[in-house]
């Protein structure tokens, strides 16, 4: 499955952002465009990308930003593999210049971002070189949470923000077997 230089959107205006699921279980997902499930007046939506091999190219943008709270972005798996229905990637690559954003922009908590590959598979590798944000709203709200996990994890050029202007900063969970 390939999304090249295109936009795939499920934005909400007064309602919560929509849901976008891209799945190629034993195949490959390649994205070099915009995938968005934002909301101008409510909570950001959810985006899930699952495949054996996931490649998010340079300057891609994936966002679930919302006024009242950030949404959910799952690339390659779920938080700590908590949802067994979500297929786990073997290789997940987020290129430099990419932005993943699950922030609240006004008065809510930041959302959740997971970039994952199967930590139990000896061939698994997660590489993240982009910017990941799950920030709390500017008026009020706590920071969200971000997880980067894989058997081998390369986060050499990553930028992370779970900050909150007036609330509590969020968390970044790093869960590799081997890290560079």
Regions found by a protein language model. Name each.
Residues 4-180:
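Extracellular and secretory-pathway beta-repeat/beta-biased strand scaffolds
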